[in-house]
């Protein structure tokens, strides 16, 4: 069983999976700082910076999050039955991934778009969404490392 998990094809998919995770979650940690740093800029510049953040979220970060989960499912399928979705850690990780996608698409990207259009009240929603997304990411990371139920 472990031979399949450690073979070159599996390892290549694992590298791309980890890379997708890094790309997907970079803004969850960086964007709150960028938003605070834009406060010293005039409103037009501030809205332009936030607009770029939102566009990158749709073009780069959201697809990376989707790819990270799909590659995770691919790794499960490549594991020669070593890992199965019936295992607690994978089931919970999949649930976290779905929740993170819902947060990103349903709250964070929408709030960033509203902020880019001048709605300063949306900043709090974006910050809360990013915070919850970060916590879900940490939970998923713990699940992936400790694998409860494996």
Where in the sequence are the language-model features?
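Polytopic transmembrane helical bundles with strong interfacial aromatic enrichment
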Residues: 1-150
């Amino acid at each position: 069983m472990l031979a399949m998990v450690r073979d070159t094809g599996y390892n290549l998919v694992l590298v791309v999976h980890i890379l997708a995770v890094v790309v997907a979650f970079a803004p969850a940690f960086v964007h709150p700082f960028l938003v605070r740093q834009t406060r010293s800029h005039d409103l037009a510049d501030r809205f332009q910076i936030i607009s770029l953040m939102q566009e990158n979220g749709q073009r780069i970060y959201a697809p990376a999050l989707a790819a990270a989960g799909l590659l995770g499912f691919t790794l499960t399928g490549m594991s020669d039955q070593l890992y199965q979705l019936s295992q607690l850690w994978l089931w919970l990780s999949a649930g976290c991934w779905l929740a993170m996608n819902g947060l990103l698409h349903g709250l964070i990207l929408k709030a960033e778009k509203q902020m880019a259009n001048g709605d300063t009240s949306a900043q709090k929603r974006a910050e809360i969404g990013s915070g919850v997304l970060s916590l879900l990411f940490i939970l998923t990371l713990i699940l992936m490392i400790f694998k409860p139920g494996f």
